[in-house]
Amino acid sequence: MAVARVDAALPPGEGSVVNWSGQGLQKLGPNLPCEADIHTLILDKNQIIKLENLEKCKRLIQLSVANNRLVRMMGVAKLTLLRVLNLPHNSIGCVEGLKELVHLEWLNLAGNNLKAMEQINSCTALQHLDLSDNNISQIGDLSKLVSLKTLLLHGNIITSLRMAPAYLPRSLAILSLAENEIRDLNEISFLASLTELEQLSIMNNPCVMATPSIPGFDYRPYIVSWCLNLRVLDGYVISQKESLKAEWLYSQGKGRAYRPGQHIQLVQYLATVCPLTSTLGLQTAEDAKLEKILSKQRFHQRQLMNQSQNEELSPLVPVETRASLIPEHSSPVQDCQISQESEPVIQVNSWVGINSNDDQLFAVKNNFPASVHTTRYSRNDLHLEDIQTDEDKLNCSLLSSESTFMPVASGLSPLSPTVELRLQGINLGLEDDGVADESVKGLESQVLDKEEEQPLWAANENSVQMMRSEINTEVNEKAGLLPCPEPTIISAILKDDNHSLTFFPESTEQKQSDIKKPENTQPENKETISQATSEKLPMILTQRSVALGQDKVALQKLNDAATKLQACWRGFYARNYNPQAKDVRYEIRLRRMQEHIVCLTDEIRRLRKERDEERIKKFVQEEAFRFLWNQVRSLQVWQQTVDQRLSSWHTDVPPISSTLVPSKHPLFTQSQESSCDQNADWFIASDVAPQEKSLPEFPDSGFHSSLTEQVHSLQHSLDFEKSSTEGSESSIMGNSIDTVRYGKESDLGDVSEEHGEWNKESSNNEQDNSLLEQYLTSVQQLEDADERTNFDTETRDSKLHIACFPVQLDTLSDGASVDESHGISPPLQGEISQTQENSKLNAEVQGQQPECDSTFQLLHVGVTV
């Protein structure tokens, strides 16, 4: 158990303070060392779960058990003398044990788990009640707490204020409803019964929070229109413009025409009459009108103040009293304070009343002595004061507390009238020109009075008119225009002397000596009086004229200086703080920027268009070059193909004729020449014939061949061979038939296939020829072996071979014609050479056939594989 620590000792009879905060206490045991005279017990920041064994502290007045783990508060039931109970930030679920605490004045249950406001009505002496940051959903019955001044309910889940007129006491001055769930702004109408409410907080509720669907509006004038005596709303002092707007909403507008449930309609109306300004100090047309009204109100207040001063100083006093008061230089502020203490003060309304002066700027108040702080001038139960501006409201500093908002200190004195005139002269100059001239004149007159050490009443218009009338009477009397009794002249002279003291302090001693003589000694006769009067009248007139001239010159200089200062200040203020001037400058900048952006955009578009055109031109040129290059390549290929065909045609014709037909057969040679001529004619005709569908429009590249061309070429070659065989049939039949060997009709297909392969592999002729020679030699050897065994059978079938000879000859002629049409001669030449070699081998093997003809040896090469 921690030991109690005595922090401070009170005087005898008042007890002491025990602070056990932060000691890690979990419970209060029965051996609690509590003295009988302890009046304050602090148990903050421990781990106490239950309040027990506090009966020993019977005289306990203040108990604080903040930031613990309390679940119940029944342990305070026997502390009947308790006045302050601080139990915030615990886990208390319900209010209990307060029925006997009739002396309780201050109760803090913030930050707990309360769901209802129960059993608090018994604490009739309660003045401060903090139930913030709980789970309270509706206002409970507090009507019996007639002394309650402060009720803090922020941070709960209250949705309606419908029960406020019945449950809340009329004496309530501070009410905090911030951070709740009030969704209808019309609920504020239920607070109209709280006539003494001065401070209200309703911020961070859904009804006043900005949403994208609802236009911005200023809810402050609407709340003030229901709570007429409200001075502070959401931590800011109610300004005079807001008060005027609230009065307009109450009297002429539709502020009270809406009922609970019409939140959207109310918000739309407030958005039109009380729009929300986004910039600080931004004034709309309505704000300008309100400022003019307030400036005129201030001007009339000053007029009433001057009239009250003049009427207080207007009664004539004896010469001795006036002479004795002038050298003392009594300030008008002291006179006003005396009049304020002697006469009663009555509040006129909410915005020109006694309460609004308490909300002045504290920093300005603290810069001046307390003896000068006053702005109240009363006459005939009329209270006058200066109006607070919006700048004062925005710059005011409020005292913060644990409950978000606390009352503003109202005991401070307001500003003095002279200081108020100096401070507000500049502001009035910015609002209204007419009022500005009056304020500048008042400021200049104050400076002049300070330099010449004359009191404030000497500068009033009434006193100046009085002095002018006195001077006129003196001049008229001297000129004999108006008969005037001698006492009047004496009084006028004395008054002028008294006034001249204020304008010429360097001649004070002389004037005082002149004044003391008539005071101490009574004039003996009329002659001495008239003599003194005749001596002083010229001097008084000259001094008065000089004084008036000096006043005019000095006043003109001050006016010029003030005009220059005011012009400079107005220019600076307009450029930096006037919303219209700032908007105009901003608009000019935006226009220039927009013009520059448009110019740059046009330039970029022009450059982009030129770039696109250049790109299109370049693309067209590339396509044209590509097309021309393809044309050139196709022409080159076509030219090569034509040259190759022509060369092959010229080179292939003689070997074929010399190989196939011997020179001793003139008939075959002539027929071959005629067939060659026909073939050449067919070659030329085939290039031009339109009916050949396989030919492309472009010249043949030489890399492809169509089947139709082969078919036509075969047909022409067959016709040629038919004509050739008819002429040489007799010579062929005369040769030996035994040397000619053809197997079957299938050999013809093999020969045609070999010719097709040779046509495809024309580029590798030499390699193919060598391989073909090896292959044919091997095949020929095998066939020779077979021929030796089947020689007898071959002789029997010689007739069959003779019958098949024309067909074989036609086939060979077809192959030769195909080679001629396509211009491929090397394979045919290789075939002829190979057949010659094979015929030599056959001659060696078959020695009994010497009469074999070379032509038939060529035909003998067609071997079946």
From Swiss-Prot:
An example Gene Ontology molecular-function term: calmodulin binding
Localisation per UniProt entry: Cytoplasm, Cytoskeleton, Microtubule organizing center, Centrosome; Cytoplasm, Cytoskeleton, Microtubule organizing center, Centrosome, Centriole
LRR repeats: 37-58, 59-80, 81-102, 103-124, 125-146, 147-168, 171-192, 196-205
GO cellular component: centriole; centrosome; cytosol; protein-containing complex
Spans through the membrane: none
Region (CCP110-binding), start-end ranges: 300-750
GO biological process entries: cell projection organization; negative regulation of cilium assembly; regulation of mitotic spindle assembly
CDD domains: IQCD
Domain LRRCT residues, every copy: 211-249
Region (Interaction with MPHOSPH9): 587-865
Domain of life per record: Eukaryota
Modified residues annotated as Phosphothreonine in this record: T542
Polar residues compositional bias, start-end: 725-738
Region called Disordered, residue ranges: 506-529, 715-769
Pfam families: LRR_9
Residue positions where Phosphoserine is found in the record: S308, S413, S500, S530, S763
Comp. bias intervals (Basic and acidic residues): 508-527, 741-760
Subunit comment: Interacts with CALM1, CEP76, KIF24 and TALPID3. Interacts with CCP110. ENKD1 competes with CEP97 for binding to CCP110, destabilizing the interaction between CP110 and CEP97 which promotes the removal of CCP110 and CEP97 from the mother centriole and allows the initiation of ciliogenesis. Via its interaction with CCP110, may indirectly interact with HERC2 and NEURL4. Interacts with MPHOSPH9.
Functional summary from the UniProt entry: Acts as a key negative regulator of ciliogenesis in collaboration with CCP110 by capping the mother centriole thereby preventing cilia formation. Required for recruitment of CCP110 to the centrosome.
Protein name as it appears in the record: Centrosomal protein of 97 kDa
Organism: Homo sapiens
